[in-house]
Amino acid sequence: MFTMKKSLLLLFFLGTVSLSLCEQERGADEDDGGEMTEELKRGVITDALKGAAKTVAAELLRKAHCKLTNSC
């Protein structure tokens, strides 16, 4: 029984230390502005995809207009 208590206490201690280290690392990432960089990358990618989608949509509309009016 005593060895089981020691094992559980050791497991609890190691889990607490691990959690503490994760929180410190997360705090360091927030201080460095890591999230801002990720948001900026997402914004750039999103803008590029929107631009490409608009270009493709405009081209499809132009072709559809051409075929519907028989002015090709």
Swiss-Prot record:
One of its GO terms (biological process) is defense response to bacterium. Belongs to the frog skin active peptide (FSAP) family. Brevinin subfamily. The gene is br2GHb. Disulfide bonds join 66-72. Expressed by the skin glands. One of its GO terms (cellular component) is extracellular region. Keywords: Amphibian defense peptide, Antibiotic, Antimicrobial, Cleavage on pair of basic residues, Disulfide bond, Secreted, Signal. Antimicrobial peptide. Active against the Gram-positive bacteria S.aureus FDA209P (MIC=16.5 ug/ml) and B.subtilis ATCC 6633 (MIC>64 ug/ml), and the Gram-negative bacteria E.coli O111 (MIC=8.2 ug/ml) and E.coli ATCC 25922 (MIC=8.2 ug/ml). Not active against the fungus C.albicans. Residues 1-22 form the signal peptide. InterPro entries: Frog_antimicrobial_propeptide. Residues 23-42 form a propeptide. This is Brevinin-2GHb. The keyword Signal applies.
